[in-house]
């Protein structure tokens, strides 16, 4: 009998996380190997968490407020979607998780990773991914993808934030040395999808996921 598995896709803005998940979803809409699939994202995944997402995307706020809202959305996400799906022995694939809070609120917004960890301590409820896949790309490639999105405000912020991009990218790359964390070159969309499928298959065929 399968154990439920929690998989997270992380990386800098423009690395291709959403495109990777959408590509995988087209190939495997409901099932992969012997697992039923649940796709989700952060912030979001539940009705309330999606409402918090809209606040985060559309309102200007203090970094600390932002961190608490991300944690609030994560609490809902874990308790109402991730944990129940894992208990049903499903494979959950999430576009971002708590590592994004460490990178963006902790480092980019400069409130500190330790502070973000404290804020998320109760939100996480010991729920961490079994496997994390880091999509990496350089600033030039990420910028081209952001330009294609057509949001001038986001693009202006992205261009001004080259140093932030480097900080966040360095943090994500530092995670690759951790257990069950894998690096995927995000420069080529087709190649990164193939690599993800290869790595995920290998991970799920391990005798144990823990």
Swiss-Prot record:
GO terms for molecular function: ATP binding; dTMP kinase activity. Its EC number is 2.7.4.9. Keywords: ATP-binding, Kinase, Nucleotide biosynthesis, Nucleotide-binding, Transferase. GO terms for cellular component: cytoplasm; cytosol. InterPro entries: P-loop_NTPase, Thymidylate_kin-like_dom, Thymidylate_kin_CS, Thymidylate_kinase. ATP binds at residues 11-18. PROSITE patterns: THYMIDYLATE_KINASE (PS01331). One of its GO terms (biological process) is dTTP biosynthetic process. It comes from the Bacteria. It catalyses: dTMP + ATP = dTDP + ADP. Pfam families: Thymidylate_kin (PF02223). CDD domains: TMPK (cd01672). Phosphorylation of dTMP to form dTDP in both de novo and salvage pathways of dTTP synthesis. NCBIfam families: DTMP_kinase (TIGR00041). Belongs to the thymidylate kinase family. This is Thymidylate kinase. It comes from Mycoplasma genitalium (strain ATCC 33530 / DSM 19775 / NCTC 10195 / G37) (Mycoplasmoides genitalium).
């Amino acid at each position: 009998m399968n154990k439920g598995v929690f998989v997270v896709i992380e990386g800098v803005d423009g690395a291709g996380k959403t495109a990777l998940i959408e590509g995988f979803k087209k190939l495997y809409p409901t099932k992969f190997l012997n697992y039923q699939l649940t796709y989700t994202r952060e912030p979001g995944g539940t009705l309330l968490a999606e409402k918090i997402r809209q606040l985060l995307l559309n309102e200007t706020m203090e970094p600390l407020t932002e961190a608490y809202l991300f944690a609030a959305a994560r609490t809902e996400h874990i308790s109402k979607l991730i944990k129940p799906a894992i208990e049903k022995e499903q494979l959950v694939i999430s576009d971002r998780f708590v590592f994004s809070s460490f990178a963006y609120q902790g480092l980019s917004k400069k409130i500190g990773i330790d502070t973000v960890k404290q804020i998320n301590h109760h939100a996480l409820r010991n729920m961490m991914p079994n496997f994390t896949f880091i999509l990496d790309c350089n600033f030039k490639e990420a910028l081209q993808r952001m330009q294609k999105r057509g949001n001038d405000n986001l693009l202006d912020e992205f261009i001004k934030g080259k140093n932030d991009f480097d900080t966040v990218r360095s943090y994500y790359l530092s995670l690759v040395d951790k257990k069950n964390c894998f690096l995927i070159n995000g420069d080529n969309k087709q190649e990164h999808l193939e690599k993800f499928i290869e790595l995920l298959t290998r991970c799920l065929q391990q005798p144990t996921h823990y």
